Amino acid sequence: MKFNAFEEKLQQDLHQYLLSMNEVDNHMPECPDVEERWEQIAQTYLPDGIREFNDYPTASLGWMMYIGMAVAKYWDAELLTADANNRSLTDNIYAYMRDKRGYDHMDEYIREEVLLLKGNEYTALEKLTGECASRVYNILRHQNIEPGSKEAFRAYVACLHQLYLTGMAVQLKRMGYHMEKMS
């Protein structure tokens, strides 16, 4: 399996879906401060995500989209800087969020306490994230990868990576950052 092509397929599917929902711009954003946190977040997330994947695959995948949104929100609020007051947030952002209510309720914590959503916005984001996770899971399942193999692990990480970047893109647009050509 060509992982770059697989990851690109995930990215294109998510982008087209979110574009149709007006949740992202034509051009996906770049935000190096958020993107550079991916590796550390993935390393800490993987033990939890892998453990949950067999029983709750869309939650295991979807939580990463919420994490991408939360990191973008923290970035916008300038809470990711080295001189930020909260060292536990800057040192291990995933563990910080997970430990607030536990892995199972991290989605609710992010929607309520980080993104400050209520009512229809809260429910709409839950549906949007669920649909994105389901789309990614569907693509993954159709790859004919042997479960538990090195290839399966790499594919799972690719799925998480695209959902993280997608979460970042959705949140950046929601906060008013638009990726459009300057005239």
What are the functions of these language-model segments?
Residues 1-183:
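Intrinsic-disorder/low-complexity detector
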